[in-house]
C-alpha cells in the first residue's frame, strides 16, 4: 500500500515516470491488482508510452470488460499505435454499451478516415455535428469531405471550424498537425495552400 500511495501522490503531481516506478514496486509486492494496473495504464498513457499503457489497460479489461473508460482508452492507445481497425472495434463496442457516445463517434470517425472508409467516417462526423460539435469535429469532417472530392462541403466545414475555434490561427495550428494524415489520404501537398486560401 505504501508504494501505491506514493505512486498516486507522484501521479497527482504529474511526475508520471516516478509514479510508474512506485506502482511497479507495488506490483512486485502485490501482482495484478486492478487499481494498480489501472494507474500504471494511466501513467504510461500520459507519458505517451502507448504500448505499455495498452498492456495494462488490457489487464484491467480482463477484470472489468464493460468499463467504458477502459474501452475508450484501449481504443485510443491502439489508434496512437496506428492499429486503426482494432481501435475502431473498441470504439464500436463503446458506442454499443453507451448510447449517443460522442467520444466513441469521434474515434470511429477518425479511424474510419485513416482506414479510407470515408462514407462511414462522414456518417459519424455528421452524427457529432448534429449533437455537440467541437472545432476539431468540423475540421475532421472537412478532411473527409475533401478526400471524397467535395471541395464546397470541405470549405464550409473548415469555415465552421474556424468560427468554432474563435480565430483562424488556432484552426491553422490544428490543421497543420493533420497535414501528414491528409497526404496519406491522397491530398496533394500543393493543394493544401490552395484550400487554405479558399477559407
Model-identified regions with their sequence ranges:
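TPR/TPR-like (Sel1-like) alpha-helical repeat modules
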Residues: 130, 143-170, 196-197
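Terminal, low-structured helical/coil segments at or just beyond the last alpha-helical repeat
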Residues: 164-199
Amino acid at each position: 500500500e505504501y508504494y501505491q500511495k506514493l505512486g498516486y501522490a507522484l501521479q497527482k503531481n504529474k511526475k508520471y515516470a516516478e509514479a510508474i516506478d512506485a506502482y511497479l514496486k507495488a506490483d512486485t509486492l502485490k501482482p495484478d491488482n486492478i487499481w494498480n494496473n489501472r494507474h500504471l495504464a494511466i501513467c504510461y498513457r500520459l507519458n505517451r508510452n502507448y504500448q505499455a499503457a495498452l498492456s495494462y489497460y488490457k489487464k484491467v479489461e480482463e477484470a472489468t470488460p464493460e468499463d467504458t473508460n477502459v474501452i475508450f482508452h484501449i481504443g485510443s492507445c491502439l489508434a496512437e499505435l496506428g492499429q486503426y481497425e482494432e481501435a475502431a472495434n473498441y470504439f464500436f463496442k463503446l458506442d454499443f454499451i453507451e448510447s449517443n457516445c460522442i467520444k466513441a463517434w469521434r474515434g470511429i470517425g477518425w479511424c474510419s478516415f485513416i482506414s479510407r472508409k470515408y462514407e462511414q467516417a462522414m456518417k459519424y462526423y455528421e452524427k457529432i455535428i448534429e449533437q455537440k460539435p467541437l472545432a476539431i469535429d468540423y475540421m475532421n469532417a472537412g478532411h473527409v469531405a475533401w478526400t471524397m472530392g467535395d471541395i464546397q462541403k470541405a470549405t464550409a466545414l473548415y469555415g465552421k471550424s474556424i468560427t468554432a475555434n474563435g480565430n483562424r490561427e488556432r484552426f491553422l495550428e490544428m490543421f497543420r498537425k493533420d497535414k501528414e494524415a491528409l497526404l496519406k489520404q491522397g491530398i496533394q501537398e500543393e493543394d493544401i495552400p490552395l484550400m487554405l486560401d479558399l477559407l
